[in-house]
């Protein structure tokens, strides 16, 4: 991707998969992670326990502080604050719901100050359909990020989730331009289901804004 980040905010950190990649790519970066589930959060702490530039907050991000229900998947990285649709279970049968648990939700500004986000900063979101609510929970600090890296779905996998088109439009209105699409997942009929999308703040694009 050719990026250089000094700060990474990892929302939906799970067991630290993305944070490990970020640490490899950006050895000196500060990483602030959010993971509401106790099992994955415990694994994350074990993985990064010796890294003084990594911190973990054990709650989800949303537009307001709350306590709510999380739908726990048999594969915990597919857990969501939104219920699964039959389509999710059909395409990814190993991700069926195994139960629910109560988690806390907060806003990004309640956990970190803008002055702590050394530029360039990246906001990563992997929250299983809850991307728009998570972004709203980050909006006060959104201008601090040069990059947003988010999973986007082209079909509804979780009830009421934002789809990729609306996610792209929301970020575009805030001067973020889609600059890369990675890891596209297709169903058995060859239709795109979801992908990871990289957005860059427009001022970083050599072509300017339109």
Feature roles, as predicted:
Residues 1-210:
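Phosphate/nucleotide-binding beta-alpha loop and adjacent structural elements of enzyme active sites
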């Amino acid at each position: 991707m050719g990026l250089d980040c000094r700060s990474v905010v990892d929302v939906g950190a799970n067991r630290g998969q993305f944070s490990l990649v970020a640490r490899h790519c950006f050895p000196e970066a500060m990483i602030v992670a959010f993971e509401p589930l106790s099992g994955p959060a415990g694994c994350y702490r074990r993985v990064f326990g010796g890294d003084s530039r990594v911190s973990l907050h054990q709650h989800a991000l949303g537009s307001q502080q709350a306590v709510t229900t999380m739908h726990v998947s048999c594969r915990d990285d597919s857990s969501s604050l939104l219920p699964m649709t039959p389509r999710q279970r059909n395409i990814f049968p190993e991700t069926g719901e195994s139960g629910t648990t109560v988690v806390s939700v907060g806003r990004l500004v309640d956990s970190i100050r803008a002055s702590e986000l050394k530029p360039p900063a990246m906001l990563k979101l992997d929250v299983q359909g809850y991307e728009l609510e998570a972004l709203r929970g980050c909006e006060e600090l959104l201008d601090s990020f040069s990059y947003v890296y988010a999973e986007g779905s082209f079909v509804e996998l979780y009830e009421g989730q934002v789809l990729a088109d609306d996610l792209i439009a929301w970020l575009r209105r805030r001067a973020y331009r889609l600059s890369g699409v990675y890891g596209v997942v297709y169903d058995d009929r060859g239709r795109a289901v979801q992908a990871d999308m990289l957005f860059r703040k427009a001022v970083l694009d050599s072509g300017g804004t339109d």
